[in-house]
Amino acid sequence: MGGQMQQNNAAAATALYDGALPTNDAGDAVMARWLQSAGLQHLASPVASTGNDQRHLPNLLMQGYGAQTAEEKQRLFQLMRNLNFNGESTSESYTPTAHTSAAMPSSEGFFSPEFRGDFGAGLLDLHAMDDTELLSEHVITEPFEPSPFMPSVNKEFEEDYNLAANRQQRQQTEAEPLGLLPKSDKENNSVAKIKVVVRKRPLNKKETAKKEEDVVTVSDNSLTVHEPRVKVDLTAYVEKHEFCFDAVLDEDVSNDEVYRATIEPIIPIIFQRTKATCFAYGQTGSGKTFTMKPLPIRAVEDLMRLLRQPVYSNQRFKLWLSYFEIYGGKLFDLLSERKKLCMREDGRQQVCIVGLQEYEVSDVQIVKDFIEKGNAERSTGSTGANEESSRSHAILQLVVKKHVEVKDTRRRNNDSNELPGKVVGKISFIDLAGSERGADTTDNDRQTRIEGAEINKSLLALKECIRALDNDQLHIPFRGSKLTEVLRDSFVGNSRTVMISCISPNAGSCEHTLNTLRYADRVKSLSKSGNSKKDQTANSMPPVNKDPLLGPNDVEDVFEPPQEVNVPETRRRVVEKDSNSSTSGIDFRQPTNYREESGIPSFSMDKGRSEPNSSFAGSTSQRNNISSYPQETSDREEKVKKVSPPRGKGLREEKPDRPQNWSKRDVSSSDIPTLTNFRQNASETASRQYETASRQYETDPSLDENLDALLEEEEALIAAHRKEIEDTMEIVREEMKLLAEVDQPGSMIENYVTQLSFVLSRKAAGLVSLQARLARFQHRLKEQEILSRKRVPR
């Protein structure tokens, strides 16, 4: 039946689109047959309202067919959809004239309120695109198909939808000849938010001369590290470590292939408000600078090629370049003779680098000159692992800006911080300083070790930011270091990150290589799992009120943090709540009276020790009270034991069994004293811990006061030393002046001797004062050291 109806619908739709209906009477006949195919022959025929052209039927309002029930609306809607689909295949030869276009209703009146927002269901909005694009592959579809009977949407929203549809259609049509731009949002999303690539460098001359072996083997997107190890009995063996990443590049891969695997997929989406970051990580001497050097130049070539396209040149898109470094937690502009920069946040919490000079670039050769100039200014040094090691993080930023119509003279007069133009996209290339282990820096001086500590700190902060970014966390810890603060806008919003891990293949650098690969693996670990930390936390939580008999009060008791000092109190609280919740006619004070009479110790937080109220005398009446516990109490306490968390498990598992046993049998006099002794021991242990904690709390404030006083005295000593240096410089200037005067002919030697004596006395007094302050501080240091040694055992 359904197949026959569809065939009738198709035949009727074909007849409607034949254009062979000369009169309105013939059109009414075909229309009646079309409606009859869906069992809607009783509805009014709207052909008369459309003139002689039946191609306007898909755009008619449903009210034009007369009054309808909900079921009839649905059938009519399906009928109109079939009409539209059949009309699509034969609409090539139809081109609307100016008269017919003017006669059509506006785009807002095409559909009834039941159809608004349902363009993805097959009803094409002819005013949202050109008639020549009806058969184009760029048909705007909705991600879901809403119900045809949804309530009418807002008119403003409908207009915004049409504007967005027109804009997206124009952009896709214009971007077709570019070839580099993505064709759909699906392809944009195909570019991974974070991509980890590993590059293996070849053995260098020094390693070849030492006849070191290559311990890294590459296979597709995975690699294996063959680590040479030695057992306890000095037997040599090889341990294999396998890693898998997005891409693994061996020593034969050129820089051009590295660019195609890392940066090239990101370049087109830079023009879609994307902020990308590419950085190289690895031990010092693993080839980071060699890898990063050609990447910005290739990226500029592709960016300039796109900027020359009419799509962007007509919008006044321009490319800007800046180059700076982070050395020792400070920022320096590499293109302005290492001018010191400041990092600030504006009112919108956007990071601004005050004083950073940006340069508009329009040629690749200009970019090469800027990069060479910046590399010459970059901080380098010699370490135990590399003779010429990068000791700073160099950041090269390429920013695409959309400029407004401004005179060139005005733009030149503006400061570099206030350049006109809105940021469209940005890509940052970061050549990180080499990571190093503390064991390799023993032969370095103090300054080199401080540099290494700052470098490792910033690298760890960068790793945490990338993991938070890949995990879609709400908070990204970009304040961990200056490096991540500067790159804050690259870690939020629409961002992409590419990490190139450079490794050394020789056996001597095996530990460094493993550390680098583990770092990269941690960065990529959350990408593999695809689970956020929130989901993991939700899955790991135990079921809370799963049993319907377990009330909310019981749940609160279960998840209350266990405290050793409240062991008896917790027992009493559970018993009281269970007895109060029971509906049987039992004396509600019975458990409390039993507890007080039976001698179970009540614990006092103020005194910090247990005091048994009375000696235990097990009488028959007490045993009857014990045996009269309701069975509901034991059942509930058994449920409490099942839901209780693992912490405090020993004490909590011991308690619920006892009431259950008491309810089944009489309690002997030997059982209850054992329970009493156990609780007394527990309370005594808790009291001792409480008193120890109290003593520690009493002594901690004095320790803090001593440390604060010592720090204040240290600052005073340093300030006094600085003042003494300034005074000494002033005295030296006075002495130079005296020497110049005494060299003059006719000078008075008596004046020279008197003034020199006064100057030397001042110098000696200052030195004596500084020495006295230094001696006092040394004495305080020794006292503090002795006190700290005494506190260690406790």
Swiss-Prot record:
The keyword ATP-binding applies. ATP binds at G282, Q283, T284, G285, S286, G287, K288, T289. One of its GO terms (molecular function) is ATP binding. It comes from the Eukaryota. Residues 580-593, 611-632, 669-696 have a biased composition (Polar residues). Expressed in leaves, roots, young and mature seedlings. Preferentially expressed in the secondary cell wall pits of differentiating metaxylem vessel cells (at the protein level). Residues 705-742 form a coiled coil. Keywords: ATP-binding, Coiled coil, Cytoplasm, Cytoskeleton, Golgi apparatus, Microtubule, Motor protein, Nucleotide-binding. Residues 569-579, 650-668 have a biased composition (Basic and acidic residues). Residues 525-699 are annotated as: Disordered. Transmembrane segments: none annotated. GO terms for biological process: metaxylem development; microtubule depolymerization; microtubule-based movement; plant-type secondary cell wall biogenesis; regulation of cell wall organization or biogenesis; trichome morphogenesis. It is found in: Golgi apparatus, Golgi stack; Cytoplasm, Cytoskeleton. Its main location: Golgi. Belongs to the TRAFAC class myosin-kinesin ATPase superfamily. Kinesin family. KIN-13 subfamily. Component of the active ARAC10-IRC5-KIN13A complex. Interacts (via-C-terminus) with ICR2 and ICR5 (via N-terminus). No interactions with ICR1. Internal motor kinesin involved in trichome morphogenesis. Participates in regulating the formation of Golgi-associated vesicles. Plays a central role in microtubule disassembly via the active ARAC10-ICR5 cascade, which establishes the secondary cell wall pattern in metaxylem vessel cells. Acts redundantly with KIN13B to modulate cell wall synthesis and cell expansion via the THE1 pathway. This is Kinesin-like protein KIN-13A. It comes from Arabidopsis thaliana (Mouse-ear cress).
